[in-house]
């Protein structure tokens, strides 16, 4: 579906646009007058605090059953109790499922469990991290933010997509929402010039570790993946989109920076210019459930409750084959799970 934007990718990536959005734009909440999610089921990853917890809260307000996907079950249970406050416990459906994105095995196990659901309508993939220090994932050798933010989420999307198709009720497809970031638009992504690309993320970053650049790169990889996936998967099967809530104070993302200067700076800046998690989560819910956006979200990017351009790299003429190249490398990486065969079964 061709989409016309009210701003160019370059202007969308600009600092002035960012500050205008942060200071002067407040995405409206969705209410049951807009959409009633009664009887529907949603998965929210990274749901034990911050944006994930608030997203779960808003979905519950719309009548949805919510599955909290968390790395530590005890924290998920604490979040569940918090969400139940002021609600009828008998009428509120909240489940806690373990999910550790640092482990492909955990992702596969989570998806297997999702097959047992009677229906699945929404998945908001909010879990992610940034690393102040460079660390590698022991099981795969990839730098941790690339493994968690990109590869594990790409695996989860791939495994969930056929479940959405099989659990589809009526004529309205479900939606998978991958959370992105403003930093995706600023990433230089110099690794794209390598051949192949993904193995470079198993090497030490040179000349020095740049956590903001690497975090942004992990997010732009996700944008490429969603763009390529939407070319191959029919919107009648499942809608796949990406979204960004902007800078939010109280986000769990800041936990890695605690005890470091960057953590202090992040907290100060987010307090000065950031939205509350309550406002930020509204964007996720719009991407996942706004009926006005509908099928137009497929393969697109939702910001401030509207469709906006992704990173300029997605549209750069010299990089038009980059998405296809990344796709093939990612399918190779996830071949152990039959990724290509799964996507082929969903091909338009």
Swiss-Prot record:
Q: What happens when the gene is disrupted?
A: Does not affect the production of flavoglaucin and congeners.
> Its biological function?
The PKS fogA releases the carboxylic acid (8E,10E,12E)-3,5,7-trihydroxytetradeca-8,10,12-trienoic acid as its product, as well as derivatives with one and two double bonds.
Record has Protease as a keyword: no
Pfam families the record matches: adh_short (PF00106)
Taxonomic lineage from the root: Eukaryota, Fungi, Dikarya, Ascomycota, Pezizomycotina
Q: What is this protein called?
A: Short-chain dehydrogenase fogG
Q: Which residues form the active site?
A: 180 (proton donor), 215 (proton donor), 219 (lowers pka of active site tyr)
Keyword annotations for this protein, in alphabetical order, are: NADP, Oxidoreductase
Cite the GO molecular-function annotations of the record.
oxidoreductase activity
| InterPro entries for this protein | NAD(P)-bd_dom_sf, SDR_fam
Q: Which Gene3D superfamilies match?
A: NAD(P)-binding Rossmann-like Domain (3.40.50.720)
Q: Which family does it belong to?
A: Belongs to the short-chain dehydrogenases/reductases (SDR) family.
Where does this protein hold NADP(+)?
51, 75, 100, 126, 215, 219
Q: Which organism is it from?
A: Aspergillus ruber (strain CBS 135680)
Per the record, the pathway is: Secondary metabolite biosynthesis
The top EC class, named as a word, is: oxidoreductase
**EC number(s) per entry:** 1.1.1.-
PANTHER family to which the protein is assigned, alphabetical? PHOSPHATIDYLINOSITOL-GLYCAN BIOSYNTHESIS CLASS F PROTEIN (PTHR43157:SF31), PHOSPHATIDYLINOSITOL-GLYCAN BIOSYNTHESIS CLASS F PROTEIN-RELATED (PTHR43157)
